[in-house]
Amino acid sequence: MSEREIDLEQALIAVIGAYRNAGGDVDKLVQDANALILGHSLYRIVEHPHVTRACEEIEKAVNFKK
C-alpha cells in the first residue's frame, strides 16, 4: 500500500467516524455514496473495475474497528 493510499484510508475512516459521532445515518451515507459512484454523477472520476473497488472500500471503512 502506498503512503497516499494509507493517508486516504485514514481520512475516509475519520470522515465516516465524524459523521457517525455527529449522529449521521451511516447506512444512508453508504447508500448515497455508492449511488453517486455507480450512477455516473459529478463525483465519479473512475471507471470499472475501480467503481466496484471504491464501493468495497467504503464498506470496509464503515466497518472498521480498531
What are these regions (language model features)?
Residues 1-24:
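N-terminal acidic leader/helix
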Residues 29-66:
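Low-complexity intrinsically disordered segments
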